[in-house]
C-alpha cells in the first residue's frame, strides 16, 4: 500500500488480511483501502469490480491521541453549514416529525446550532413553524406584525398565538402608529368582537425616532420600565420594534445562530419538485432549504436543486441529500447544492440497508463524499449513526463540517414526539421518516412512493421510543463537551484543523467491547453515557 493511502498497516509482521491487523488512517483526505480480497472474474473480468473496498463506521475506528497544548475549553467548535451560514456548534437537528418543529429549532439556534423543520406538515403549518422561530428572538424587528384599530380583539388573540408574540403594535392604514395591544389588555375581556380601538393603549407610548442602537434601546426600556420600544419616523409611521426580551436573550445566548437582522436562523425540508412549499418558506425568511430524499443521487433531486438555485430571486442556500458516494456528492454539487448530506441507512430507526440491501458504512461514506466536496469548498453534513459524542468527533475528523442529529435529540423536552410512560420510566416517541406511520402522514415521497396507497407502502423505518433526556441546553452542552475533549486529545484548536490533521486507527471487535464500561454494574449513570444505547435496549 502506498504512502497516499488513507489507512496503513502498523507492522509488516502482521498478515495483510488478518483480522488482528491494526490500520492507521493517514493524512486527510484520501479514501479508505483495506485490500479486501475480491472474487476472481471469468475471462471477461465481469466480476472484477463487484466487491469494493472494505467500509467502516464509527465503532470500527478510534482517533489517535497526539501531543497537545490545547485546552478543551479554549477550542473553537464553530463550523460552516454552507458557505454563507456558520454555526457556533456543529449540530443540526434532523427534519423528522418526532424531532424538529419550532420549539426544537429555537432551542438549538440559541445554543449556536440549527434546526430543520420537517415537511410532514401542510405548507401553511410548516411556514408558521418557521415564522415562530424567526419571531422568537430579534435584534431590531424591521417588519413587526401589526393590526388595525378597527379589527376585533379575537383577531389579536389569534395572531399573538400564531406569531408567538406578547404584544402587537396597532397602526392605521398608512402605517401611522395608533397604539399597542398586549396580552395583559386581553386577559379579562369577555367580548371577542370588541374592536381593538376600545382596548388598546393609546397614551404614553414609549417610542424612539430614527436609528437606535440596542444599547440605547435597553437604556430607554429600563428607564421607562416597559418591555417594548416602538420605532417610528418623523411622520410617526411605524418602522420597527425592539423588545427587552430580545435584548436579554442576546445577553444570555451570545453564541446564538442568528441572521444579519438578529433573528434566529432556521431551515426547512422540502420534497422533490415542491416549489410551492419552497416559495412560501423563502417568503417568510427561512435561511436554508433541505431537499430531503432517501436517495439524493437521483434525477428528481438533482433537477429540484438545479431549479431552486437557478431562480435568482429566491437567493436561498440549498442542502441536498442523502448520498453515500463520491459520485452522488459530485452530481449534487454540480447541480448547485450549497452543502451535501451524507448517510444512507445508518440511523437507529432506519431499515433501508436490510430491506433494500443498499448502503455504505457511514465513515466510509463521509470520506468518499468529502474527497470531491472539498475540491469545490462545499461542506458535508454527516447524517445518521451518531450514538455518542465521540461519534461527532469521528464524523468531523473524517471530513464532515457538521453533523445532523435525530435519535439523540428525539428524547429531549423540545422534540414534538409524545411523552410515554412505560414500566415506571419516561420516554418519548421516535420514528423514522420511512416508518409506516410517517409515510402515511406524508413522507412517502422521500422514499419515492408518493401516491401509493397505505396498504402498498414498503416502509424503510420503524417506530419506537427513546428515554426522556430533559432540556436541550444541558444535553447539547454534553455533546459539545465531548467534541471539545476529543479536539484536546488530538491537539486541534478548530474544526478545520480536526478535519485536516486527525488520524484514525482501525480496531477489532474486542476493542469495541473494551471501549465501553466493562466488568462493572453501573449504579449511577453519567449524563453523557447510557448503557441502553450501547446495548441497543430502549427500555
UniProtKB/Swiss-Prot annotation:
Q: Does the keyword Oxidoreductase apply?
A: yes
Q: How is its activity regulated?
A: Mycophenolic acid (MPA) is a non-competitive inhibitor that prevents formation of the closed enzyme conformation by binding to the same site as the amobile flap. In contrast, mizoribine monophosphate (MZP) is a competitive inhibitor that induces the closed conformation. MPA is a potent inhibitor of mammalian IMPDHs but a poor inhibitor of the bacterial enzymes. MZP is a more potent inhibitor of bacterial IMPDH.
Where do the annotations place IMP binding?
348, 383-385, 406-407, 430-434, 460
* Entry's Gene Ontology BP terms: GMP biosynthetic process; GTP biosynthetic process
Q: Which reaction does it catalyse?
A: IMP + NAD(+) + H2O = XMP + NADH + H(+)
Where is each CBS domain found?
140-196, 200-257
**Main enzyme class:** oxidoreductase
This entry's Enzyme Commission designation comes to: 1.1.1.205
Pathway involvement of the protein, from the record: Purine metabolism; XMP biosynthesis via de novo pathway; XMP from IMP: step 1/1
Names of the cofactor(s): K(+)
In terms of PROSITE patterns, this protein maps to: CBS, IMP_DH_GMP_RED
Where are the annotated segments for Disordered?
Answer: 517-539
User: What is its quaternary makeup?
Assistant: Homotetramer.
Function according to Swiss-Prot or TrEMBL: Catalyzes the conversion of inosine 5'-phosphate (IMP) to xanthosine 5'-phosphate (XMP), the first committed and rate-limiting step in the de novo synthesis of guanine nucleotides, and therefore plays an important role in the regulation of cell growth.
Kindly provide the name given to this protein in its UniProt entry: Inosine-5'-monophosphate dehydrogenase
Amino acid at each position: 500500500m502506498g504512502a497516499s493511502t488513507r489507512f496503513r498497516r502498523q507492522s509488516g509482521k502482521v498478515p495483510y488480511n488478518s483480522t488482528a491487523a491494526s490500520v492507521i488512517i493517514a493524512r486527510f483526505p484520501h479514501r479508505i483501502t483495506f485490500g479486501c480480497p475480491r472474487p476472481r472474474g471469468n475471462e471477461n473480468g465481469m466480476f472484477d469490480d463487484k466487491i469494493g473496498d472494505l467500509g467502516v463506521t464509527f465503532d470500527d475506528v478510534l482517533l489517535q491521541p497526539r501531543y497537545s497544548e490545547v485546552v478543551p475549553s479554549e477550542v473553537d467548535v464553530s463550523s460552516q453549514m454552507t458557505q454563507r451560514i456558520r454555526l457556533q456548534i456543529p449540530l443540526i437537528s434532523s427534519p423528522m416529525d418526532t424531532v424538529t418543529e419550532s420549539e426544537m429549532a429555537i432551542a438549538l439556534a440559541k445554543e449556536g446550532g440549527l434546526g430543520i423543520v420537517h415537511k410532514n406538515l401542510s405548507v401553511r403549518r410548516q411556514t408558521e413553524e418557521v415564522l415562530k422561530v424567526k419571531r422568537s428572538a430579534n435584534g431590531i424587528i424591521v417588519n413587526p406584525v401589526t393590526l388595525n384599530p378597527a379589527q376585533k380583539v379575537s383577531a389579536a388573540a389569534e395572531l399573538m398565538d400564531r406569531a408567538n408574540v406578547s404584544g402587537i403594535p396597532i397602526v392605521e392604514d398608512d402605517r401611522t402608529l395608533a397604539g399597542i395591544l398586549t396580552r395583559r389588555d386581553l386577559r379579562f375581556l369577555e367580548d371577542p368582537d370588541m374592536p381593538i380601538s376600545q382596548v388598546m393603549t393609546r397614551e404614553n407610548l414609549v417610542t424612539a425616532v430614527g436609528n437606535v442602537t440596542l444599547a440605547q434601546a435597553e437604556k430607554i426600556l429600563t428607564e421607562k420600565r416597559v418591555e417594548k420600544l416602538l420605532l417610528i419616523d418623523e411622520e410617526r409611521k411605524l418602522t420597527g420594534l425592539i423588545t427587552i426580551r430580545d435584548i436579554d436573550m442576546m445577553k444570555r445566548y451570545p453564541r446564538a445562530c442568528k441572521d444579519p437582522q438578529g433573528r434566529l436562523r432556521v431551515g426547512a425540508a422540502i420534497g422533490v419538485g415542491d416549489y410551492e412549499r419552497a416559495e412560501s418558506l423563502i417568503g417568510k425568511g427561512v435561511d436554508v432549504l433541505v431537499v430531503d430524499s432517501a436517495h439524493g443521487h437521483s434525477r428528481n433531486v438533482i433537477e429540484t436543486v438545479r431549479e431552486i438555485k437557478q431562480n435568482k430571486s429566491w437567493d436561498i442556500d440549498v442542502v441536498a441529500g442523502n448520498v453515500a458516494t463520491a459520485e452522488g456528492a459530485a452530481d449534487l454539487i454540480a447541480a448547485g447544492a450549497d452543502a451535501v448530506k451524507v448517510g444512507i441507512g445508518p440511523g437507529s430507526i432506519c431499515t433501508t440497508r436490510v430491506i433494500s440491501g443498499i448502503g455504505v458504512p457511514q465513515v466510509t461514506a463521509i470520506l468518499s463524499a468529502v474527497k470531491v466536496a472539498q475540491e469545490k469548498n462545499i461542506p458535508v453534513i454527516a447524517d445518521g449513526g451518531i450514538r455518542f459524542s465521540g461519534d461527532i468527533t469521528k464524523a468531523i475528523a473524517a471530513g464532515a463540517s457538521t453533523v445532523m442529529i435525530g435519535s439523540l435529540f428525539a428524547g429531549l423536552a423540545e422534540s414534538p414526539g409524545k411523552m410515554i410512560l412505560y414500566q415506571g420510566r419516561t420516554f418519548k416517541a421516535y420514528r423514522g421518516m420511512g416508518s409506516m406511520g410517517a409515510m402515511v402522514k406524508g413522507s412517502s415521497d422521500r422514499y419515492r412512493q408518493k401516491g401509493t396507497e397505505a396498504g402498498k407502502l414498503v416502509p424503510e423505518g420503524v417506530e419506537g421510543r427513546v428515554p426522556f433526556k430533559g432540556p436541550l441546553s444541558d444535553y447539547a452542552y454534553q455533546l459539545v463537551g465531548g467534541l471539545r475533549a476529543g479536539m484536546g486529545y488530538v491537539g486541534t484548536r478548530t474544526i478545520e484543523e480536526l478535519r485536516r490533521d486527525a488520524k484514525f486507527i482501525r480496531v477489532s471487535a474486542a476493542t469495541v467491547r473494551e471501549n465501553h464500561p466493562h466488568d462493572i454494574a453501573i449504579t449511577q449513570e453519567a449524563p453523557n453515557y447510557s448503557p441502553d444505547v450501547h446495548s441497543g435496549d430502549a427500555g
